[in-house]
Amino acid sequence: MDYLRGNNKVDASNEEDIEIQIVGWHNYDDHELDEELTGEDNEFNVLITGIDSLKRSVAVYVEGFKPFFFIQIPNDWKKSHVSILAEACKKHYMIDEMYCEDLEKFSIVKRKPFYGYTHDDMFKFAKLVFRNKGAFHAYQNIFRRPLRVRDLFGGQEHYYELFESSVEPMLRMMHVRDIQASGWIRICAKDYHVNKPSLSNCQYDITVPYKKIVGIKKDAVGDIVFAGFD
């Protein structure tokens, strides 16, 4: 069985640039692996597996990406209005206690909606950023129906339209970093950490911040091994 890559470990270091053709994608919150992990310990993670240009199997544990979506807000709103809304959402009965503090931050941006005729007008949106995908989905549910917040809209119910909420966090990260699902990526030397002990059966096992991954154009096909049985 020596021909199996997993049985031929390499003495890995972070002294070299790595180019990897992606074979597989996985994503998870830390809580999915250990139910005791909550709060700041419950982060969103992505695992990329692939083959590098030296034919080594590689597992890339990607950290630091925060799921987010947008809601449309009135054009006269300031950050203080969004703060009131965010605090009300954290206390909403639909939010499980484990996610109440996982709405990490928010900001106001101006964008042009993709749908509908708006001429060239720009509209205000609140960008809500979350610690993990569990909170990302939980907070969406609040906005799927009219919401009443005492200090907003005179205490009357208001429907906040969701935008880009259907884009899963892993796909969002791929788009942000311009990565193709089965394409090539580059990670520069010193930008990643070699996991010791390894977290996988791959020959190269590393952890890297998502901002250090770059999608690249490359026509070569990695030396991928396919296994099957009758």
Feature locations, PLM:
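The two-metal-ion catalytic cores of nucleic-acid processing enzymes
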Residues: 1-229
